[in-house]
Amino acid sequence: MAKNYYDITLALSGICQSARLVQQLAHQGHCDADALHVSLNSVIDMNPNSTLGVFGGSEANLRLGLETLLGVLNASSRQGLNAELTRYTLSLMVLERKLSSAKGALNTLGDRINGLQRQLDHFDLQSDTLMSAMAGIYVDVISPLGPRIQVTGSPAVLQSPQVQAKVRASLLAGIRAAVLWHQVGGGRLQLMFSRHRLTTQAKQILAHLTPEL
């Protein structure tokens, strides 16, 4: 059966978008607010009608992730910011595989996400309350599956509880995207053997987005 590289590329961009948000937060203490909203909302929406629907139904919502994906696919150096992004992306994929083989953790994750939906009736998606709740899910359900993702950045920035919560919430969104990636036919071997196909697809999607002003 032929792979749907459009859906695979969208889901992979979702993982990369989370990785980029983590990097921005860890180094700067803030991140692309629109991209963060899209990624966090992907965790909450339990019944999307398509792969693109997970990310709000618009390719433009994944611009940051698509640009990051191209950087990861074409990274020649094992050092620097692209190496960081590659490490975060691969680590999220590893954790997702561990999650998918742990039925108890999957059930717990579903229950906790249902709880988030109830909180959304009273709090904004990017409120400290929701951020802390998402971070708590990551710490309680995902982190114990191991290995832990080592986030690197500014030590002063990473001491902030608000930044820590946003980083963990972004990692939770990355796990959501990694689950989706496998559901639509993604696999780590594609990063080695289908790099050109993924690069071409990501460039095609970016090409027909309206330029940012």
From Swiss-Prot:
Segments forming a coiled coil: 79-122
Main location: cytoplasm
Entry GO CC: cytoplasm; plasma membrane
Keywords, ordered alphabetically: Cell inner membrane, Cell membrane, Coiled coil, Cytoplasm, Membrane
Protein's cellular compartments: Cytoplasm; Cell inner membrane
Domain of life: Bacteria
Membrane topology: Peripheral membrane protein
Membrane keyword on record: yes
SUPFAM superfamilies assigned to the protein according to its UniProt record, in alphabetical order: YcfC-like
NCBIfam families on file: PRK00218.1-1, PRK00218.1-2, PRK00218.1-4, PRK00218.1-5
Entry's family note: Belongs to the HflD family.
Entry protein name: High frequency lysogenization protein HflD homolog
Organism: Salmonella dublin (strain CT_02021853)
